[in-house]
């Protein structure tokens, strides 16, 4: 029923609510329902986090398990487009990694650096992109102060987080849910 509302133009967004992920995704991914396009489909979640001054997007925690660089660019573009649809004029996206420095033993940091560089030279998404950056630096100006890290959007300026993979994103959102209930 919700899919029909979206495909006929009477609705703009699907919300999962308390449905199991499989039950939510199966009709979404079914090509005959008409939601899929030529673009890579990814999931964007908006969350209210204690101590964070605005809603924060997180992607992708549901569809792309371990995105390659091309898929990561599509996820960034999808997230930026979703935020723009919600009224964010120039979304600021953080490419989350375990650490904020490029480390050749951590491929996610290298990929984040490459994506930020590519976005500066040949923009592929309508957003500002920063990374690699660890989660504590995304959320906390105090963490930046303690680590002597300079980021203009830390502590409330980021509009979204692009996680390294589905496991990182899913773990992060579940921790948000648990802490929000306490």
Which functions belong to the PLM regions below?
Residues 1-154, 159-164, 168-182:
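Anion-binding alpha/beta catalytic cores of soluble intermediary-metabolism enzymes, centered on
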């Amino acid at each position: 029923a919700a899919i029909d509302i979206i495909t006929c133009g009477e609705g703009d967004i699907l919300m999962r609510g308390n449905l199991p992920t499989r039950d939510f995704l199966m009709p979404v991914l079914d090509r005959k329902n008409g939601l899929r396009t030529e673009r890579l489909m990814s999931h964007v979640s908006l969350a209210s986090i204690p101590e964070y001054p605005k809603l924060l997007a997180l992607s992708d925690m549901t569809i792309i398990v371990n995105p390659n660089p091309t898929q990561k660019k599509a996820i960034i573009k999808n997230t930026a487009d979703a935020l723009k649809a919600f009224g964010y004029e120039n979304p600021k996206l953080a490419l989350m990694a375990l650490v904020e420095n490029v480390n050749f033993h951590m491929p996610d940091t290298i990929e984040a650096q490459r994506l930020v560089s590519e976005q500066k030279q040949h923009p592929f998404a309508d957003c500002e992109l920063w990374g690699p950056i660890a989660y504590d630096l995304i959320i906390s100006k105090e963490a930046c102060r303690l680590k002597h890290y300079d980021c203009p959007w830390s502590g409330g300026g980021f509009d979204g987080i692009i996680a390294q993979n589905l496991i990182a994103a899913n773990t992060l959102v579940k921790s948000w849910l648990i802490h929000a209930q306490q």
